[in-house]
Structures are given as C-alpha cells and as structure tokens.
C-alpha cells in the first residue's frame, strides 16, 4: 500500500493497533506499508499471476519479463510502458518515473534521505552524507547505487516520491581558526563558484 493514499486511515490507527500489525510482520515505512515476507520471488510471481487472472487486458509477455527481472533480484529496472502501475505494485515494485523500484529499496532510500534532511547547520552535530541546509539534501553515490540508477532516471524516482530538483550554490564553510583569514576567504569564494544540485521537500517519517 502506498502510504499517502491511506493517510486518513493511518491517522485513525493508534499505536497499540500498529504494534499488533507489526507482530504479524507488517512494515510501516515512509512511502509504503507492506509485508517483507511477500518480497520473496515466489510470492511475488504468484501474486502477479493471480492478479493477471482477474484482469481483462494484461500483456502477459510484458508481465513475464517483469516477473523474470523481479525474480533475478534486481532492485530496480526500466519500466515497461505496456504494464500498469498496479502490475508493478503486485510485484512489490513502485512505478517511479522511468524505472520500477522495489518498495523495500525505496524505504532504504528514505533511511538515507531522512538524516540528511533532519540535520541543521550550526548545531554542532556531525553533518551526514547528503545534508545541505536543513531543508534540502544533495544526491549521494549511496542513494544512486541503492536504486541502480543515476542522472535523469534517478531524478524521476525522486520526483515520483514528491521531491523536486533544484540547483544552488553550496553553503560557505566556516573558516578554520588555524587558517589565515585571507586563505579562508579564498576557499569560500572558490566553493561559491561551484553549483551543487539540491533536492527540496518535506521529509516523510517512517516507523
């Protein structure tokens, strides 16, 4: 289940009820609510076949190709336009822009993005990878490696999750007291000349 689509129901689900569901293996993620046990290849293939039997116009060749890619352990693969979003959903993938990405991978992506968004400059806390200004984050290699995509493909994944891409100059770094003021100023000037991509949105919370 895509969490935003059942946001109202989630508000009515109290913590004791969620605890009961967790005992049965339900995972409450930032973007999805799912059973990790159903991510196994056999379960996904069976679910997609049962779903296809109830549909009238499923492209079985395209579905078979997606089943094969899913069973091979791919965390993501190019989306086939012949398949609907529901077809990927029963395979436990999300149709995310130009790619279909396994839902647990999107939750791991959320785990990388969350600390980058929660970090605040000037607090003395260690700056996590991808942190920018406390309201946005920069894309890291760990994020793109996790989804097996980069460039516009990865940008389309982020857009499907509600993020928007932006380009901004990097924040000036605080000068090192041991350095001469002129040297620190020169370094800050050089850094400001280089633009860094930033992604801006509100952070989603997982449980």
Stretches found by the model and what they are:
Residues 176-207:
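Long, low-complexity intrinsically disordered regions
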Residues 1-151, 156-157, 161-172, 176-183:
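Acidic, serine/threonine- and proline-rich low-complexity intrinsically disordered segments
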